[in-house]
């Protein structure tokens, strides 16, 4: 279990940007891990082109949920809905199917910090908390028709 909570995960968990709420979110969603009780509340706004223009979130999560949320918060603004769905799908595949670290062809390094979460694949009971931010973001995108 110690390999899960390495220094980089703890650093990401301690430095989570965009905490709080938006004045006028386009969509908002909650995700909860039934196993550990971790919670994420996400709010975002999209431009007409389907790119995220603003983002905020509130967390009551373990270090893994905080670390994945930290990476999301650093990378989401300016990302397209299409890319966010792709990254979420790749993240699930990384954890559940031993897939590669999420990467976009046109921006191969953008989501590279998710690699630090690859050891979670061996701990199935930690998948849900690690994926909370992705579930909530995709819920928001779906609400907005993307």
What are these regions (language model features)?
Residues 1-20, 79-146:
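C-terminal binding/interaction regions
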Residues 68-80:
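Alpha-helical support elements that line or immediately flank enzyme active sites
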Residues 66-67, 86:
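Alpha-helical macromolecular-interaction surfaces
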Residues 60-66:
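Short, thiol/selenol-centered motifs that function as redox-active sites or metal-ligating centers
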Residues 34-36, 64, 125-126:
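Secondary-structure capping and boundary motifs in well-ordered enzyme cores
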Residues 19-59:
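Structured beta-strand/loop patches that form or line metal/cofactor-binding pockets in enzymes
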Residues 44, 74-76, 86-88:
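Short C-terminal domain-edge/linker segments immediately following a structured domain
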């Amino acid at each position: 279990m110690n390999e899960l909570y390495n220094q980089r995960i703890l650093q990401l968990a301690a430095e989570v940007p965009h905490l709080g709420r938006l004045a006028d979110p386009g969509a908002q969603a909650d995700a909860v891990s039934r196993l550990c009780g971790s919670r994420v509340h996400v709010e975002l706004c999209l431009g007409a082109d389907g790119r995220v223009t603003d983002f905020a979130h509130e967390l009551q999560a373990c270090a893994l949920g905080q670390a994945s949320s930290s990476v999301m918060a650093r990378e989401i603004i300016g990302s397209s809905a299409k890319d966010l769905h792709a990254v979420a799908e790749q993240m699930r595949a990384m954890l559940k199917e031993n897939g590669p670290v999420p990467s976009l062809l046109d921006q191969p390094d953008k989501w590279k910090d998710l690699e630090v979460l690859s050891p979670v694949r061996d701990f199935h009971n930690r998948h849900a908390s690690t994926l909370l931010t992705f579930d909530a973001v995709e819920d928001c995108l779906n609400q907005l028709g993307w």
